[in-house]
Regions:
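Conserved ABC transporter NBD signature motif
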Residues: 68-83
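A short, surface-exposed alpha-helical micro-motif characterized by mixed small hydrophobic
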Residues: 202-204
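Conserved ABC ATPase "signature" region
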Residues: 107, 111, 117-133
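Helix-to-loop junction immediately C-terminal to a conserved catalytic motif
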Residues: 61
Length: 245
C-alpha cells in the first residue's frame, strides 16, 4: 500500500519545482507547473495521452529545455547540468545495447555503478529477468524490455528515479509484481516520479498525485486530500480527475 499521508508530511521535501513552462512555438505544452516531491514517496503524474506527462519528465530530467522554470534539490538550485547527479530518467521504449545479451548489459551497468554481483542477482530476481538473461535485448518482449530498464534504474545510485509509463506492457499479475518492486525501492529511501495514464494503477501504487490536463496542473495531493477538495468522500481517482478537469 502507498505510504500514509502522515508519514509523507514528516519527510523532507527533496525536489521543488515552480513556474515551469514549456512552449513549442505558439503552443504551450506546459503552463506554470508547480510541484514538490518528498523523500521516499512515489509521486504520480496523472493524465491522458497528450496531457504533458512525458514532456514534464523530459524537462525535469534536462532532456528538453524549459522556457521558464525554477528547480531546487534539497533547497539548492538544480540547473540542467547537475540533474544527472541526482536523478535517473527511464523513458518509454528505450532498449540499451540492442544486440547484446541481457546478462551482459546488466553486468556492464553493474560495473559502471560498482554494484557487487550479489546486489545485481537480487535485482535480477526482483524484477523477474532470470528467464531471459541469455536473450539479446532486441528479442525481448515489451514487458521484458521494461523489466530490463527497471533493473538498470535500480542499479543506479541517484536518489530520484523518473519513469514514463512503468506498467505499460504488463498484465495484471506482472503489474502487481512491479508495483511491489517500486514500493520496496521507495521504502528503502529512493524517491520516484511516475507518469501513468492508467488511473487504477496509479491509485494502487502512488502516495500523491499531480493531475495534468492540457499541460496544466488541475490538482495535487493524496487521494484523501483530492477527495476532500472535490467533495467525493469515496471517489476513485478517475472520478476525481473528471471532476477537476
Amino acid at each position: 500500500m502507498p505510504l500514509s499521508s502522515s508519514v509523507e508530511a514528516h519527510a523532507p521535501i527533496v525536489l521543488q519545482v515552480t513556474a515551469l513552462t514549456k512552449r513549442y512555438g505558439d503552443q504551450v505544452a506546459l503552463a506554470d507547473i508547480a510541484l514538490t516531491v518528498r523523500a521516499g514517496e512515489i509521486l504520480g503524474l496523472i493524465g491522458p495521452n497528450g496531457a504533458g506527462k512525458t514532456t514534464l519528465l523530459e524537462v525535469l530530467a534536462g532532456v528538453l529545455p524549459a522556457d521558464a522554470a525554477a528547480l531546487c534539490w534539497r533547497g539548492h538550485p538544480l540547473p540542467p547540468a547537475r540533474r544527472r547527479d541526482v536523478l535517473f530518467y527511464l523513458p518509454d521504449g528505450l532498449r540499451p545495447y540492442d544486440e547484446q545479451p541481457v546478462a551482459r548489459v546488466l553486468a556492464f551497468f553493474a560495473g559502471v555503478y560498482r554494484r557487487p554481483t550479489a546486489h545485481l542477482a537480487c535485482i535480477v530476481a526482483a524484477v523477474g529477468l532470470t528467464p531471459v538473461l541469455a536473450m539479446r535485448v532486441h528479442a525481448l518482449s515489451k514487458g521484458y524490455s521494461r523489466r530490463l530498464m527497471l533493473a538498470v534504474g535500480l542499479l543506479t545510485p541517484q536518489p530520484l528515479l523518473l519513469m514514463d509509463e512503468p506498467f505499460d506492457g504488463f498484465d495484471l499479475r506482472q503489474t502487481r509484481e512491479i508495483m511491489g518492486v517500486l514500493q520496496r525501492c521507495a521504502a528503502a529511501g529512493r524517491t520516484l516520479i511516475l507518469a501513468i495514464h492508467q488511473l487504477l494503477d496509479a491509485e494502487r501504487v502512488c502516495d500523491r498525485f499531480v493531475l495534468l490536463a492540457d499541460g496544466r496542473v488541475r490538482g495535487v495531493g493524496t487521494l484523501d486530500e483530492l477527495r476532500t477538495r472535490t467533495q467525493l468522500p469515496a471517489g476513485s481517482l478517475e472520478e476525481i480527475f473528471l471532476a477537476l478537469t
